[in-house]
Amino acid sequence: MKYELVAGFETHIELATDTKIFCSCSTAFGGAPNSHCCPVCIGLPGTLPKLNKKVVEYGIKAGLATHGKIANISKMDRKNYCYPDLSKAYQISQLYAPLTIGGYVELSSGKKIRLHHIHIEEDAGKLIHSHGDTYVDYNRGGVPLIEIVSEPDIRYIDEAREYVEKLQQVMRYIGISDCRMQEGSMRCDVNISVRPEGSEKLGTRTEIKNMNSISNIMKAMEYEYERQVDLIENGGKVVQETLRYDDATNTTSSMRSKEDAHDYRYFRDPDLVTICVTDEEVEEIKSTLPELPTEKYKRYVSEYGVPEKDAQLLTKYRNISEYFDKAITDLKKPKTASNFIIGQMFRILQTEEDKEAFDVKTTPEQLNELCKLIEGGKVQNNLAKSTLDKMLESGKPCTEYISEEDMAGLDDSFVDDLCRQAIEANPKAVEQYKQGKEKAIMACMGYVMKNSKGKANAQDVLEKIKSMIS
Amino acid sequence: MGYIEKIQSMLQNGEISCVELTEKYLKAIEEANGELNAYVTVTPEVALEQAKQVDEKIKRGEKLLPLEGVPMTLKDNISTNGIETTCCSKILKGYKPIYDAKVWAILKKNNAILLGKTNMDEFAMGSSCETSCFGGATNPFNTDHVAGGSSGGVASAVGGDIAVFGLGSDTGGSIRQPASFCGIVGLKPTYGAVSRYGLVAYASSLDQIGPITKTVEDASLVYDVISEYDENDSTCEGRQGEPTYDTLNNDIKGMKIGIAREYLEGVREDVKEAVLEAARKYEEMGAEIVYFDLPALKFALPVYYILACAEASSNLGRYDGIRYGYKTEHYEGIHDMICKTRSEGFGEEVKRRILLGTYVLSAGYYDAYYKKAQNLRGTIIKAFDDAFKNVDVILAPTVPMTAFKSGEATSDPVETYLTDICTVPINIAGLPSVSVPCGFNKNGMPIGMQIIGDKFKEGKILNVAYKYEQACPENFKDTKWGVKL
Ligand SMILES: [Zn+2]
């Protein structure tokens, strides 16, 4: 029998606000233990939380960017559990009335992974084990998080990867988090169950907690899928439990079963007032959002004729797409600029971090200038490429490297003349071309390129000659 | 004239220096505290340093700020930077906060003289002050009797004249009940009128700080100072409208004073009689007494104990021995450490309420208890809202009885919970209420009545209370203790 994977995600994302969610301590990563702390975030008796408005704003941005509905009224709840890294013995979170409801993440296939909701909450501190003792560092305690809870819509491990990458991409675009899994600013819990293909009923699910890299998520899901299928095929039953993934052994192991699952005793936090957000405020925040990657991607492919694969690369990071958008403002063929970015520029931006930062010496305006020379038929592609390489190294404009002479005489009428001459000089080749021998036309091309000293645009020339013959 | 104004004029006229005055109070504490057990921490260094500053100010010819130079005390659940704040619990013994509660910050800025921290029921859970790990405070009218709770220490200190005023906290009657037992004035402000920042939480949606004083004027003066907006407490709006002091002496002719029949049920005869006598006094002053029904009151006690315990179970989770306070000596591993620390550090009543609160919030019981109690809270709020459409204030007994003898309260917890029946509805509805002495029983123990107002109508209830004080000064009696000015 074939088994279908059913998976859903709970993704925690640390928000890039300057200060914590309920006090004015810094959220900066690192720092000496307990140096970013105050009476509020270490939960001293009598202290009270004060909600950071930026956290609400960022949460709303996340909701809007994933097509969710922003709740006009939402509330903070207490999630009670006792652990040394949690200074108040409860986490302030949202359960009964979260900030945003619904929404989806669209995969490249067009499939939509629906979201249940997004809520805001505080992070806990960290335990540090050293010399046989355990210490607590509350620097991370009170750092704002959003938790994005998806519906169990994922059916393939590749979809899981794309879902996480898309979330990362969108959250970075809207500037609310750097989503660095290795630093813990993005963490995923995955709910997994399997069921016979064609079945509508959900199987018993397990939850793999706190995964901190995409490759671990994929490996853990693969392992857990196999484990559950094996179990069922051998007459066993999946037990509802919380699992931990160990990447050294590539296995999952039980953290706790359903029986000893926490009872969090959620209730409304009486120290915080209702969060009221008006439709006008939502609209205002919406107007500050940049164009989102999926929309950009669609625009590049359908309006600009950029190949899908290239459009994906261009939209992967906000800096690249914004550079591209600036470079192509008045170009007839944006694809020229796209080719330069993915060809020339990506060659010098090798790591993902470099690409994300997209810190190149050539300004988008300078790239635009170069592309316009090509469009005007003043510069041929090969020359432009080598020129761009030099520009990227020096930061100087293309006019530094392409002389007036290089560009002279290459106006359209001059090329037209050359084409006419080429046809006259190669009657035999023209005849052959007319009879269907496509390649024969290369003889005429050669003539034009040679007499223009290689400066003519090959593509233009080809089209010109073809139209003159027919 | 209240005691605060009297002291400030004495200071300003040079009749006594602030240091002399403070020393007088410190000496009186030394003499009386052995029997009253009102103070758990005395802070002579802080007090005398503050007093010196006040004297210098007077010497420079500067005018005193409100409450400046007036010796006072804070309940031991109000955080004081560098000064032990224990909530009278073993689990917080030795704990010195590193920040000031908002109310203490205000009083400090105004140079009110802090004599020390006063006794209370452990974490404010109790009606007799006897759940304190330091033993209970006693009643200045008769030390065989309790001072009441939970702010028993403040009431005992103010009633015994070893503080001019004090700040207590009231979650289900903890200001008004001990004030009533000790024959003095206790104001529980509207929820949100005074910042809770720095008040060690018992039940956050019910807790409110307020003054305990000997006269209504004093309560008004203190309230006007502490009812400041505080951005650190999201639920705090501060005082609404003009200072209550400005309207104390307003005419109450034609005012409608409501008496809810339910409030007189199950109340001891002498208490009931004293309250009705007060009502007659008001009629003489031209007010109209309106009897009405408030059936929602019968839900108040169960609603209170469910909500208060639920919030307490969460608020008190942080006392685990890791960061501050008491920590058990011998343990194996973190789980054992937390269990032993809490088992040894909390007293019986606190444990009982944590267990109760944990139970009503747990999966499977939440709907039946907590959620239902929340809904009923809405019903009670609405009932009071409706009542205030027809009356200006409500008159009621503060406690169904007078101060009981020490040891009587601890025997049956449910019986003790019943003594809160008149006070808890006010916390549930978030309303202001002031308890005022209105007579004595045949054994000379004080009886108190409360004047309840609509939200943020502190001005009105203090006005009504002041008029009574003017008419019946005989009910405001001194005891044999303390400083006589
Ligand atoms: Zn902090």
Description of each model-found segment:
Chain A
Residues M1-E291, S302, E308, T329-K333:
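Basic, nucleic-acid-interacting segments
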Residues G184-P196, V301-D325, P334-E352, T362, ...:
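Core structural elements
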Residues G377-K378:
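Extended, charged alpha-helical coiled-coil/arm scaffolds that mediate oligomerization and mechanical coupling
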Residues E438-S470:
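Short, amphipathic C-terminal "tail helix"
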